[in-house]
Curated annotation (Swiss-Prot):
The gene is MPS2. Its main location: nucleus. Residues 216-235 are annotated as: Disordered. Signal peptide: none annotated. This is Monopolar spindle protein 2.
Amino acid sequence: MSNGAFDAIFEYAWGQIDKPISGDFIYGKDLPKLIEIIENIFQKAQKSGSYELRLPLFSEINKDLFRTFSNTKTFFKIHKEEFDDIFFNLVNHPLREILENAFIGVDSIPSDFIVSMNLNSPSKFLVENKSKNTEGAGISTPRKKLTESPIKLLSRNNIGKALEVQVEELKRELTAKQSLLQENERQVSELKIRLETYQEKYASIQQRFSDLQKARQVEDNQNSSRTSDPGSPLVTGIDQKAILEEFRRRLQRQTDTISFLKDQIRRERGLNCSNDKVSHSKRKHATTDGDGTFKNFISAVPSNIWVKATIRIIVCFALLAGVLPYIRKYVYAHDTPSQNSRLQLSWWENSGILSKIVWFFEDQTDLETEYRSNANVDDAYSRVFGI
């Protein structure tokens, strides 16, 4: 590995930026320019065709890092002995390794690369040594300084003014950074105070929580000891009062239900019996009246006349029964139906004897039906309540 070739390339690029008048450093804003000078050297070597190179040397990401560094640290002084560390922190690779890997088929920078690219021009240190040697030999005299041209003096004055401007900018930047540091320190102190306050509150809350937890545990232990004792008054009170009260409440509810059902059944039975008695008495009264009249009529008429009259009545009744439908059909054929047509009585309802006979059998049937239904209700009630 040729360290001399790398040093020559680095010294050449450094000398293009670091002029003897500015000192042994470059500013952060000059870092992209230094990288560009090194890339131009390798691009010229590739164009000449003397060497096979891997270009570009630096990726776009690395170039963005260089530009960001130059923008954020514009007037940061990069000394030559600190350059390797700063460069490695930016791209995570040393500059020497990047330049040596650029040559294809060679592990290091060829020694004749410097000669082919004409990089043997005197660097800053050679210029400084030459100036020192000439001063030691007595070549330069105060008279020469007096005879310097006004253009050189003006250029030196411009450089001095530029340096003064840079110094002022650096002072302003330093003042801004100091104020920023003071503000950060103030915020840090406030945050420390708030942190201490929150720590005290947290300790207080934690203490209260532990006290409440202990009190709750003691209370639970006391309750468990009370409930675990079978002879305790609490357990006795629950067994005697709560259970008996629940039984009483259920028994009262069943008693009320039974009383309500009994009253309802009694009311239904009383209503049916009263209706049956009223209807039966009315019909019986009508029947007795008719029977009395019929008996008086029979006793007043002789037996032979009664037999003839009975035969004649039966014959007449048969004739009327056969002719009556035709007469009714003829009489009511052209009548329009009215709303009261449904209320007209049947032909047997107009006869007192026939209506009494039919009503008697219907009443007997209804009474038997009601008796059976009431008996079924009583049986169901007895089965439900166990009576």
